[in-house]
Structure formats: structure tokens, C-alpha cells
Amino acid sequence: MSSESKLSQSEKELSGLVLEQKIKGSRKVSNYLVASMLSIGGVGFLLASFSSYFGRDFLPLGNPSTLIFVPQGLVMGLYGVAAFLLAIYFWRLINIDYGSGVNRFDKNKGVLSLSRRGLFKNIEIEIPIDEIKAVKLEVREGFNPLRRVSLRIKGRKDLPISRVGSPQPLLDLENEGAEIARFLEVNLEGI
């Protein structure tokens, strides 16, 4: 029992000196749906093209064997190949969980470590915590809305650290920014 209490106490001390945030990547329901629809649609177009070329129905619906191959069957085959290539790309992004990673603020080492999963390699960035001037909230509404948390860094451009994708609710964005600003003991800008 005493070892458990010591462990929890050391975890609390560690959590007071280290703030770690997990960032979600491309493993979202919407990406699974898009990849599935592209796969099914691509196979459907390819089967329609093959039906047109061979004169046999490979699809249970419709009668694609009656299509003339040169204009329609060929174009349907090209659509099928394009959809299939896009589906492969989406499945690859989902497989590697593109964009996922960790924001780790470590007061012991005095370093902010950002890591993200890239398409071909992982991206690692380390910045000294004392170079962070402020935490900035960016909110832009309209056709292409933007809601993100960025860090104002001395001598550099702002560094976005929030997840990419659908805009976060404003309350969640404010809470995330306030938590980081409180931990780093810097100002929160953009409210």
C-alpha cells in the first residue's frame, strides 16, 4: 500500500513538472467512410469498364456490358483507377495515423517536444521553454473556419500545436490554451 501511495505521489510531482497532450491523427470515422466509399466506387467503375470491354456483366446491377468501350467504358475505367488510387492514399493515411503525436512540455529539461506522424517519416521538434513568449488562440469564422492554439516564440513564427481537422468547440479551445498558459506561466492572447 505504501508503494502505491509513493508511486501516485511521484506521478503527481512528475505531472506538475511535465504536461503531455496527445494529438489525434487521421483515424477518424469520416476518413474511414471516405476511404470505404472510394474503394467501393473505384471497384464498381472498374467492373463496369471491364463489363464494357468483355461484353459480359460483372456487376449485379444495371447492364454495363451494353456500353460502348471506347468513350464510356474507357472513361469509367479511368475513374475507377483514380478512385482506387485515392482510396489507397486514404487507407495509407489511416494506417499510419497521419498527424497524430504528442506535445510534451517538460520543465525538468526546460524543453517543449513536439512529435507528429508524417507520411514518410516522423517529425520531431524541440524548443526551449524559456523562448515561449505566450500562448495564442486563433479563431476565424466563415467559409474556411480556423480554431487553433499556437505558441508565440521569440524570433520565430507562431507554432500551431493543436490538432488539425474539424474546428474544436470554442470552450475546449479556451480550456486547452488556458491549461498550457497556466503550466508555462505565460500570457494567453487572442481571447
UniProtKB/Swiss-Prot annotation:
GO CC terms: photosystem I; plasma membrane-derived thylakoid membrane
Keywords: Membrane, Photosynthesis, Thylakoid, Transmembrane, Transmembrane helix
Major localisation: membrane
Keyword 4Fe-4S: no
GO BP annotation list: photosynthesis
Protein location: Cellular thylakoid membrane
Membrane topology: Multi-pass membrane protein
Name of the protein in its database record: Photosystem I assembly protein Ycf4
Organism from which the protein derives: Prochlorococcus marinus (strain NATL2A)
